[in-house]
A protein has these predicted regions:
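Well-formed, non-transmembrane alpha-helical positions, independent of function
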Residues: 19, 121-122
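Conserved catalytic-core motifs of GNAT/GCN5-like acyltransferases
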Residues: 35, 109-111, 129-146
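Residue-level recognition of the GNAT/N-acetyltransferase active site
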Residues: 80, 84, 113-115, 140
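Short glycine/proline-centered loop/turn elements that form peptide/ligand docking sites
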Residues: 89, 93, 115-119, 136-141
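Conserved GNAT acetyl-CoA-binding A-motif
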Residues: 100-111, 122, 134
């Protein structure tokens, strides 16, 4: 498998959603329920849900979030545990940054548990800077959130 054979693209259909839910279940103590994603997918003008697709159509990771006032607010970026440590999280992030820039969005925002060193390293390595913190934002366990952002360069859509 080469980087060229891996794609980041919009979620397509129930099979992709099943894969996203499986990644959620493998990654988080409290995964997001199917009904939430089903509702969000009814708002394509606002909701962003992109998948990291390996050859053979296997979904190995995803990113979800919302467009708001020229920003992309990321709620989740996750790679299935079987595929971690291979650079796929960075690929998913880089492709999403490029997509958001082509869409004319100005910033990407997100928050991360203070103890999530791997995620903080990923985002800081991609040019995100800390702009704040949210005290006791997370529960189970209670923990602060680090708020990060990255400004996006304008990159017009091809053919626009």
């Amino acid at each position: 498998m080469t980087p060229e054979t891996v794609r980041v693209e919009a979620l397509e259909g129930a099979g992709d959603l099943d894969a996203v839910l499986a990644i959620e279940a493998a990654s988080f103590a409290h995964p997001t329920p199917r009904a939430f994603y089903e509702r969000e997918l009814l708002r394509p003008d606002v909701t962003v849900l992109r998948v990291l697709r390996l050859p053979g159509c296997a979904v190995a990771g995803f990113v979800s979030g919302w467009r708001a006032a020229g920003d992309l607010e990321i709620s989740t970026l996750a790679v299935h545990p079987d595929w971690r440590g291979r650079g796929w999280g960075r690929r998913l992030l880089d492709d999403t940054l490029a997509w958001a820039s082509r869409e004319g969005l100005q910033r990407m925002l997100l928050d991360v548990r203070r103890s999530n060193d791997a995620a903080l390293a990923l985002y800081r390595g991609a040019g995100f800077v800390q702009t704040g913190e949210r005290r006791r934002y997370y529960s189970d366990p209670v923990e602060d959130a680090v708020v990060l952002e990255r400004r996006l360069p304008f990159s017009p859509k091809i053919g626009a």
